[in-house]
Amino acid sequence: MKNILLCTDGSDFAQQSYPYAAWLASKLGGNIKVLYVTDIRAQKAVESVNLSGSIGLGTSEELLKQLVDLEHTKAKLNHQKAKLVLATAKNTLQQAGIESVQVMHKTGFLLDCLEDLKGDFDVIILGKRGETAKFAQGHLGANMERIIRSIPKPCLVTPKQFQTITKVLFAYDGSASCQKILQFLAGSSLLADLPLHIVTVGKTNQDPQAIANLGTAEKVLEKAGFKLEVELLVGHAEEAIVRYQEDNAIDLLLMGAHGHSRIRHLVIGSTTAQVLRKTSIPVLTFR
């Protein structure tokens, strides 16, 4: 995870992702690229306007010219905003001690840009919600869900308030995405110095598959030298995981974006999406 891509739109949520990016880069000795994407949809909408059928030809041409001029002005303002947001992010990261920071401004769709860049980064960081957060409280950012579903890289989803990471929780279900997390933890020094809690959610406290899953994870991570707390939870997965996180003052949650059994693939209403909605800590997902 040496190459970190930090997505920002300048919102409150995005700005709180900067210290998490700095923490990750400092722990890994990594570099950060900061990406700001100007949405192309508004520009395309004006280019496709045809007013000739609704008002007089001369009037429509004049109005369309005014609309185009307005869009040019908006484009300049968007460019200035992007420069300001990126400069603020770079300054914040450098003040936090990160020397290797690059900034990028692209126009288009965020997901398309990430697809183009996915060979250039190892992990992506973005806020749980973006600029429209105050208008859709309780919802996840639309970009965030699509990114987790589509980009085959770990994704750190950050909350509105930064807090120092001192304890980590791994929600393990034995799925392929959780196996990736297990391999990452065993082979990385990122979280090796922090207490690690492992939980899985079973149908009962005697669930044989859940017990086997916990045993597998515990064996691998004990061998890797982690100080572990292991717990079998019972109930609705998302509620049990969030309750455990709150009761044990966990600062970082790791879970698979796609799972099976009690932790299912990421769709609206799934365990991963529900946990992301309900928790107030950063969540590192693996696909």
UniProtKB/Swiss-Prot annotation:
Gene3D superfamilies: 3.40.50.12370. It comes from the Bacteria. Pfam families: Usp (PF00582). Belongs to the universal stress protein A family. This is Universal stress protein Slr1230.
